[in-house]
Amino acid sequence: MIDTAMARLNEGTIVIYALSVLFYFIDFLQHNRKAGKMAFWLLSIVWTLQTVYLAYFMWVTGRFPVLNVTEALYFYAWVLVTLSLVLTKLLRVDFIVFFTNVIGFSMIAIHTFSPTEQQSAAFSGQLVSELLVIHITMAILSYGAFSLSFVFSVLYMFQYHLLKKKKWGKWLLRIEDLSKLDYMAYVLNVIGVPMLLLSLILGVIWAYVSLETLYWFDAKVLGSFVVLLLYSYYLYIRLIKELQGKVAALWNTACFLVLMINYFLLGSLSQFHWFS
């Protein structure tokens, strides 16, 4: 009963950790102080829950959690979270904190969902199934963000066409101005990219603990990483090259088309993505 409660505690920690990484990503890209504060407080909750788990573990076992790889991963994740909190307070180095927490998230996910000798086969199978559910849910949420971003880009190009042709009318009045459409498409991609990244991390962990062979060259796996790279490049051209407007809208539309090809076509060719 207590072991089940601890497993639920770790699963809740992963969800909160994912939200923290999302807000750190927003702060990293946009220097958003509110997002940074939210990320910090969510990470503080993660640290508290991890500390509770470590204290319980040491109380039950009477030893420090470093005697095997799985235990050491959790302690490693706790150290990374602790360092992230210290860095955030003292130095405010967004780049380092974000990527440190991506690593920490991976470590705690591996610890939580990897079967151990103390767990029954049924309980281990339940954890793996729950990992798969979280992986799929996060992927779908990222797809939802990308879909809305695509809609805003299409509306941008439609509005751009109306203005260029000087076709004034009710359609022009009902659609938001170009700058807002462009900004909303960007914001939704800022949300979608880290969610897809975390989903892929969880998917790789699920494949590692549940499949005999890790299908790195599976069509859907490769396609998903290509989608992540394309949307990451979209953020790159927005932030580094400062390309906005029509160019960004066209690139965003191309990214979404690749996303749809990956979901429907490559998903049907996948060796194990039967849920697609």
Swiss-Prot record:
It is found in: Cell membrane. GO terms for cellular component: plasma membrane. GO terms for molecular function: heme binding. Keywords: Cell membrane, Membrane, Porphyrin biosynthesis, Transmembrane, Transmembrane helix. One of its GO terms (biological process) is cytochrome complex assembly. PANTHER family: HEME EXPORTER PROTEIN C, PROTEIN HEMX. This is Protein HemX. It comes from Bacillus subtilis (strain 168).
